[in-house]
Regions:
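Short alpha-helical segment of the dimerization/phosphotransfer core of two-component systems
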Residues: 24-29
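A conserved beta-strand-to-alpha-helix junction within the catalytic ATP-binding
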Residues: 50-68
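Short conserved segment of the HATPase_c
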Residues: 141-153
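Short conserved segments within the C-terminal catalytic ATPase subdomain
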Residues: 70-81
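Short alpha-helical Gxxx[C/S/T] motif in the catalytic ATP-binding
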Residues: 166, 170
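Conserved micro-motifs of the catalytic ATP-binding
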Residues: 44-49, 90-93
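Glycine-rich ATP-binding loops of the HATPase_c
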Residues: 178-184
Length: 192
């Protein structure tokens, strides 16, 4: 309906905005369906990983590349601080599932922390473990909601759209990789 509106086709800028709405809504619905399918597989034990050597930094960079232009169009700056790739050895994991985690967290940062108009991402090594940090500079998460944000279907007080299962799926994927998925309020504001 958006493109079929005769008023839009006369104005190229309005047409571009209409197409952007369609793309964003398609992406949102596709993500929601994928999350629901993954959640169903996790619940009945059909969720599996395709384990191989994975360059964690390259997977994060792919996710950043996927979202950078979308964020720019929404007025959100996405800063990336790469680690020293030579010092980050491959890990054993599922590259697609790890990229799914990064994309979901980046999307959440934009939805819930977008008011800060800035998101930063980094990868590095701490105490022998590879660590990926994604931070928004928005209002953060109310302290009373922090213990629940990774629970299935929990949406908190945020008005942002979503299924409420994305972070639960991310948490499960990271656990299946032997990792830890933490969410906290960042010093100086925002969440990471």
């Amino acid at each position: 309906e958006t493109i079929l509106d005769d008023d839009l086709t006369d104005d190229p800028e309005q047409l571009r905005r209409g197409i952007r709405v369609i793309v964003n809504e398609s992406r949102r619905l596709s993500t929601m369906v994928e999350e629901l399918l993954d959640f169903s597989k996790m619940e009945d034990g059909r969720f599996t990983l395709q384990i191989e050597d994975v360059d964690l930094q390259a997977e994060l960079e792919d996710a950043i590349f996927t979202y950078q232009e979308l964020f720019r169009q929404d007025g959100i700056a996405l800063e990336y601080h790469p680690g020293d790739g030579d010092l980050l050895p491959p890990i054993r994991g599922d590259s697609e599932r790890l990229k799914q985690v990064f994309c979901n967290v980046l999307d959440n940062a934009a939805k819930h922390g977008g008011a800060g108009r800035r998101i930063s991402a980094s990868v590095g090594q701490e105490s022998g473990c590879q660590v990926v940090r994604i931070r928004d500079y928005g209002p953060g998460i109310p302290e009373e909601e922090l213990p629940f944000v990774k629970q299935k279907f929990y949406k908190g007080t945020s008005r942002a759209r979503g299924s409420g299962i994305g972070l639960a799926v991310c948490d499960e994927i990271v656990k299946l990789h032997g990792g830890t998925f933490t969410i906290s309020n960042a010093i100086g504001g925002g969440a990471e």
